[in-house]
């Protein structure tokens, strides 16, 4: 999790800009995460619905392309872990690490997912997913697939997107793959 001084610095940076802004990651406390989940279920919000439809159509083919043997999926900005279910249904996933800034919301979602998929080793990591994180040692021997669904990367400034992708590589390690 970002320290208080890091949060202050990021907020001040956004408020001192000519076009004021706040980092979107700070919208997603427990209440914000629940609100976003409700928004994604509205008929007007086509992004989630379209993305899920694309996954349903393309995941069988992607499974053949990805073809990792001992697979750990690391989801950046996991939120309610809604979309990972499609991955779990199509790929032979042995471990799953959802990363999100909203720890309460994340832990609740991960507990529910653990009940649905008891064969998958699930470890919820409460952290700022835009920064590199250290995964527990028990995942060192796994092939890693980074998963960053949605249009979230479109919310990043170019430099922030580049920094995120570099951090993703640091989190996952060499030889990883990423599905965005």
PLM features: residue spans?
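N-terminal auxiliary segments of SAM/dcSAM-dependent transferases
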Residues: 1-26, 33
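Class I SAM-dependent methyltransferase Rossmann-like catalytic core
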Residues: 20-65
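Conserved class I S-adenosyl-L-methionine
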Residues: 69-79
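Conserved SAM-binding strand-loop segment of SAM-dependent methyltransferases
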Residues: 117-131
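Conserved SAM-binding loop of SAM-dependent methyltransferases across substrates and taxa
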Residues: 80-92
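A short, conserved alpha-helix within the catalytic core of class I
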Residues: 155-167
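Conserved beta-strand signature within the Rossmann-like core of class I S-adenosyl-L-methionine
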Residues: 171-180
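Conserved SAM/SAH-binding beta-strand->alpha-helix loop
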Residues: 102-103
């Amino acid at each position: 999790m970002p320290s208080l001084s890091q949060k202050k610095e990021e907020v001040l940076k956004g408020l001192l800009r000519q076009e004021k802004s706040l980092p979107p990651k700070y919208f997603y406390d427990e209440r914000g995460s629940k609100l976003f989940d409700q928004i994604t279920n509205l008929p007007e919000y086509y992004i989630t619905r379209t993305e899920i439809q694309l996954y349903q159509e393309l995941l069988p083919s992607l499974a053949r392309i990805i073809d990792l043997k001992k697979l750990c999926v690391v989801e950046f900005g996991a939120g309610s872990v809604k979309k990972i279910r499609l991955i779990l249904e199509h790929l032979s996933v042995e471990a799953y690490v959802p990363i999100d800034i909203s720890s309460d919301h994340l832990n609740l979602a991960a507990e529910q997912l653990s009940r649905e998929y008891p064969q998958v080793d699930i470890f919820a990591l409460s952290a700022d997913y835009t920064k590199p994180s250290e995964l527990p040692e028990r995942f060192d021997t796994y092939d890693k697939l980074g998963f960053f669904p949605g249009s979230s990367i479109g919310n990043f400034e170019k430099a922030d997107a580049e920094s995120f992708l570099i951090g993703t590589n640091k989190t996952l390690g060499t030889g990883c793959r990423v599905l965005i």
